[in-house]
UniProtKB/Swiss-Prot annotation:
UniProt EC number: 1.14.-.-
Transmembrane stretches, start-end: none
Species: Drosophila melanogaster (Fruit fly)
Functional summary from the UniProt entry: May be involved in the metabolism of insect hormones and in the breakdown of synthetic insecticides.
Domain of life: Eukaryota
GO-annotated cellular components: endoplasmic reticulum membrane
Annotated positions binding heme: C445
Location of the protein in the cell: Endoplasmic reticulum membrane; Microsome membrane
Name this protein carries in UniProt: Probable cytochrome P450 6a19
Family label: Belongs to the cytochrome P450 family.
Length: 503
């Protein structure tokens, strides 16, 4: 009995020592930080009253003038992180010294949760090789070849909206309709599939997209492990994605591969690149090829990124245009002028002339960055010029995109929607990393060109054809949902829509 009691006391002593060491790390280092709570660290409000984006924004804005170094300490559950408070050091981490911070340090489980093992999460040389292979899929030439396909989906969206406001109410929840637009765009551009999401309210592509991003497989305790201790979660075999989501996307990818291989279909698209890599793997070239599960994972993340990031950006932009009618009028005038110069047609070349549109989208992404924070991990020890701010290998790094975008030093009156902030002269006055909607450096968003193209096409068609005004159901200022991985609106964005009548 005495031996057992001694063992229990010994174990409890070790646990207490670990807790004390872990949660006093930043205090012992003398690094400014908010006092942590055990076991949630500085994230006690997470998914209950505030999204992680809000917590990190608050931390950034609080400590940006209160620290004698480039970062503050932070505890994401039990993991020690830094929150960068100096945009020049953001550039150091993302660009200058990328070789020391090249991994994101987030959960991915190749064995038990294969779709999470994708370009956004994988690490080291494996990531570098895959990134190089996929980059050519998103060249300007490829975008130009897909333009008419995206435009056709956009024209269908206009017909659907026109029918809805003619036959029933003039009020629509716009994030729903633009989500269906981006779902159909990604379906046809990535998989060669006509998803019919715009016409079918129960389209499986849309429902599975929502499930992958918003439905939780576990309660908060397992999520604590997955997000706070990802390596331990992998060792324990925990899975993040729902089984129904895994099954759906695996089947879609397998069916697409089978169809193209049997019929010798070539579309020169993202899926063709992945199929080529799978064939290399099947021939024994493991270094340059991809196994089926890896192919499915890349297709999955491409769909989710295009579906959610594109639709959310469009939704937030329509919201801001409804709040700022003068901006909406100015944008519509530009669209009409460009269309008139190109015989009433939106073309790839005419899209390049929508300069004010670019500023409007950038200002929307500034106020509401869909990816509201960036994550990295120190893969090597890093010595800052101030010795106190040494970073140990394995320390997590967080960049609050939302915080930087709302920093009054870079954006005076940050809550106001002012597209002119992105006039060329104004942009030159700001640091490089004061605007990070797509990240920066070698690990920025690979699908940036595609994402911008689908957003510009969708918004140009909508603003040309319809006027958007606020509905009382939509809050001002915007309220963000507390349980999304990406930034999203709480309760949707309900707007009044009327058709633009021209003489």
């Amino acid at each position: 009995m005495a031996i057992l009691l001694g063992l229990v006391v010994g174990v409890l002593t070790l646990v207490a020592w670990w807790v004390l060491q872990n949660y006093t790390y930043w205090k012992r280092r003398g690094i400014p930080h908010d006092p942590p709570n055990i076991p949630l660290g500085n994230t006690g409000e997470l998914w209950r009253t505030m999204p992680l984006a809000g917590i990190l924004k608050r931390t950034y804005l609080k400590f940006r003038k209160q620290t004698d170094g480039p970062f503050a300490g932070f505890y994401l559950y039990a993991m020690k992180y830094i929150v960068i408070t100096d945009v020049d050091f953001v550039k150091t981490v993302l660009i200058r010294d990328f070789d020391k911070f090249h991994d994101r340090g987030v959960y991915h489980n190749e064995k038990d949760d294969p779709l999470t093992n994708n370009l956004a999460t994988i690490e080291g040389q494996k990531w570098k090789n895959l990134r190089q292979k996929l980059t050519h899929t998103f060249t300007s030439a490829k975008m130009k070849s897909m333009f008419s396909t995206v435009l056709n989906v956009g024209d269908e969206m206009i017909r659907v909206v026109d029918e809805k406001i003619s036959s029933s109410s003039q009020t629509l929840e716009v994030t729903d309709i633009v989500s269906r637009f981006t779902s159909d765009v990604i379906g046809i551009c990535a998989f060669g599939l006509k998803c019919n999401s715009l016409r079918d309210p129960k389209a499986e592509f849309v429902q599975m997209g929502y499930s992958a991003l918003r439905e939780r497989r576990h309660g908060w305790l397992v999520d604590l492990l997955i997000f706070g201790m990802p390596k331990l979660a992998v060792k324990l075999g925990f899975q993040f994605l729902l089984p129904s989501v895994q099954k759906f996307y695996m089947k879609i990818v397998q069916d697409t591969i089978d169809y193209r291989m049997k019929r010798k279909v070539t579309r020169n698209d993202f899926m063709d690149t992945l199929i080529d890599m799978k064939q290399q793997y099947d021939k024994g070239d493991k270094e340059n090829g991809l196994a089926f599960n890896e192919v499915a994972a890349q297709a999955f993340v491409f769909f989710l990124a295009g579906f959610e990031a594109g639709s959310t950006t469009m939704g937030f932009t329509l919201y801001e245009l409804a709040c700022n009618q003068d901006v909406q009028d100015k944008l519509r005038a530009e669209i009409d002028s460009v269309l008139e110069r190109y015989n009433g047609k939106l073309e790839y070349d005419s899209m390049q002339d929508l300069f004010y549109m670019e500023k409007v989208i950038n200002e929307s992404l500034r106020k509401h960055p869909v990816v509201a924070h960036l994550a990295r991990i120190a893969t090597k020890p890093y010595q800052h010029s101030n010795p106190k701010y040494f970073i140990e290998a394995g320390t997590g790094v967080l960049v609050s995109t939302l915080g930087i975008h709302h920093d009054p030093e870079f954006y005076p009156e940050p809550e106001k929607f002012i597209p002119e902030r992105f006039d060329e002269e104004q942009v030159k006055k700001r640091p490089t990393c004061a605007f990070l909607p797509f990240g920066a450096g070698p690990r920025n968003c690979i699908g940036l060109r595609f994402g911008r193209m689908q957003v510009i096409i969708g918004l140009a068609l909508l603003i040309h054809n319809f006027r958007f005004e606020l509905h009382p159901k939509t809050p001002v200022p915007m309220k963000y949902t507390i349980n999304n991985l990406l930034l999203g609106s709480e309760g949707g964005i309900h707007l009044n829509i009327t058709k633009v009548v021209r003489d």
